[in-house]
């Protein structure tokens, strides 16, 4: 006779190879807190509804609380033969309190049980991931305040484009990570409904109080269709999508950190604590943390694609394929949290070479647009001004000089609209200061943006 909790229908036990292949306890044991919390709420409801005796419910709850304490103290060894965290806990409970433990699963299936556990787990992890994102945003705002006047080149196509400030650049990432926070909040709102009571797929004949269990566990409501409650993992996929966007933003920032810390740019220097050396070349100081985050981005993309692929062809309701959701979800959670935890202090401690940034902003004709704008303000159409300045840039390239190095006679030869004030108008400091439009790099606009971001964060 099989000793499986589901073994009554079978004449012989599972092959050992199948047992090992089938078991998920190796990775789903991290759900023990959520599983026990859900079971306690379920047992309490069973007792309150008179489905089991109140004394039996209390005995089950007390047993589950002791199991929780023993797991946290490292006194529990899980059994591969019991398959998963749900069956392991029920097996331990029954061994400790006897046949009363067998009543815990009344009106419940592992299908709705695991759907509940994963929701509880993801809700906890979204809270922590959001905290890490807000910590990063706080650091970015602090660094932005330090560098409101630190001029640097802005780029398009990785070619110098227009002068901006480091604060303005950092605030772009504040916006991106702020949207990442919003996505996590939205994701949690959508899945914060309890599937418990959906049973295997068609609910149950027992008079369960689904709403009471949902409220005890902090859910906003219950799933409205038992098939949907157990058969979809769109909430896990949505999280992995949000996680992929977080990683994409981190990866873009890391790419810039890697470039900026190179000798060719030399805009920043990373703290020794967030750099590594070479086993052969003694002079090397490598931005390995940034490179590794950039590399791990593809890993999280892979987690998203794996979940989408698992779910793409599954008929309703539950299928064993869905056991494959957890490792990818857990990996995405761990990777994002790990990257945020190391990225934030790296940004907090990096040293900015402001003079080097400003020198970079003075090269590459970053003030060319301002020359065209100057002409437009003098009454020249912008398209004509664009043509004039393009020819001026070509002349400068041929002479190996900057626009501001041209003589006033050179300017007048290109257009009689130029006056002596052109030299002040095209200084990089003036180019930045004049961009006062909301969202622009002018110091006052940046300070307003920092204040607005702080208010959103509070």
UniProtKB/Swiss-Prot annotation:
GO aspect biological process, one term: L-arginine biosynthetic process
InterPro entries, per the entry: Arg_succ_lyase_C (IPR029419), Argininosuccinate_lyase (IPR009049), Fumarase/histidase_N (IPR024083), Fumarate_lyase_CS (IPR020557), Fumarate_lyase_fam (IPR000362), Fumarate_lyase_N (IPR022761), L-Aspartase-like (IPR008948)
Pathway in which the depicted protein is active: Amino-acid biosynthesis; L-arginine biosynthesis; L-arginine from L-ornithine and carbamoyl phosphate: step 3/3
Reaction catalyzed: 2-(N(omega)-L-arginino)succinate = fumarate + L-arginine
Compartments reported by the entry: Cytoplasm
UniProt entry tagged with the keyword NADP: no
Pfam families: ASL_C2, Lyase_1
Protein keywords: Amino-acid biosynthesis, Arginine biosynthesis, Cytoplasm, Lyase
UniProt GO cellular component terms: cytosol
EC number: 4.3.2.1
UniProt keyword Amino-acid biosynthesis present: yes
Molecular function terms, GO-annotated: argininosuccinate lyase activity
Similarity field: Belongs to the lyase 1 family. Argininosuccinate lyase subfamily.
Name the UniProt record assigns to this protein: Argininosuccinate lyase
Organism: Heliobacterium mobile
Organism taxonomic ancestry: Bacteria, Bacillati, Bacillota, Clostridia, Eubacteriales
């Amino acid at each position: 006779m099989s000793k499986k909790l589901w073994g009554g229908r079978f004449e012989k036990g599972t092959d050992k190879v199948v047992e090992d292949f089938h078991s998920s306890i190796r990775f789903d044991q991290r759900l023990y807190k959520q599983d026990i919390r859900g079971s306690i709420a379920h047992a309490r409801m069973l007792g309150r509804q008179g489905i089991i005796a109140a004394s039996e419910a209390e005995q089950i709850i007390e047993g589950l609380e002791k199991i929780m304490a023993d797991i946290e103290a490292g006194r529990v060894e899980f059994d591969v033969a019991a398959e998963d965290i749900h069956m392991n806990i029920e097996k331990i409970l029954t061994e400790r309190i006897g046949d009363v433990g067998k009543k815990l699963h009344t009106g419940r299936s592992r299908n709705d049980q695991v759907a509940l556990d994963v929701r509880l787990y993801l809700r906890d992890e979204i809270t922590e991931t959001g905290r890490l994102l807000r910590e990063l945003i706080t650091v970015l705002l602090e660094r932005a305040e330090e560098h409101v006047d630190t001029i640097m080149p802005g780029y398009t196509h990785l070619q110098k484009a227009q002068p901006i400030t480091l604060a303005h650049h950092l605030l772009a990432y504040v916006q991106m990570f702020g949207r990442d926070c919003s996505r996590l909040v939205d994701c949690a709102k959508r899945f914060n409904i309890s599937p418990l009571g959906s049973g295997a797929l068609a609910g149950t004949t027992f008079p369960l109080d689904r709403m009471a269990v949902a409220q005890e566990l902090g859910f906003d409501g219950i799933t409205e269709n038992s098939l949907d409650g157990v058969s979809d993992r769109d909430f896990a996929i949505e999280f992995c999508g949000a996680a992929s966007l977080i990683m994409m933003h981190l990866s873009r920032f890391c790419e810039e950190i890697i470039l900026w810390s190179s000798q060719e740019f030399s805009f920043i220097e990373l703290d020794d604590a967030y750099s590594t050396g070479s086993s052969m070349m003694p002079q090397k100081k490598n931005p390995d943390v940034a490179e590794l985050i950039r590399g791990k981005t593809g890993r999280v993309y892979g987690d998203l694609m794996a979940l989408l692929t698992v779910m793409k062809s599954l008929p309703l309701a539950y299928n064993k394929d869905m056991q494959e959701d957890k490792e990818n979800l857990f990996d995405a959670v761990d990777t994002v949290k790990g990257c945020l935890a190391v990225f934030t202090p790296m940004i907090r401690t990096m040293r900015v070479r402001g003079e080097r940034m400003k020198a970079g902003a003075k090269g590459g004709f970053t003030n060319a647009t301002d020359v065209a704008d100057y002409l437009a303000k003098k009454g020249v159409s912008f398209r004509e001004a664009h043509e004039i300045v393009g020819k001026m840039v070509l002349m400068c390239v041929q002479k190996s000089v900057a626009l501001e190095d041209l003589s006033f006679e050179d300017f007048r030869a290109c257009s009689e609209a130029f006056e002596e004030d052109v030299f002040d108008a095209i200084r990089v400091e003036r180019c930045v200061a004049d961009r006062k439009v909301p969202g622009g790099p002018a110091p006052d606009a940046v300070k307003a943006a920092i204040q607005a971001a702080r208010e959103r964060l509070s």
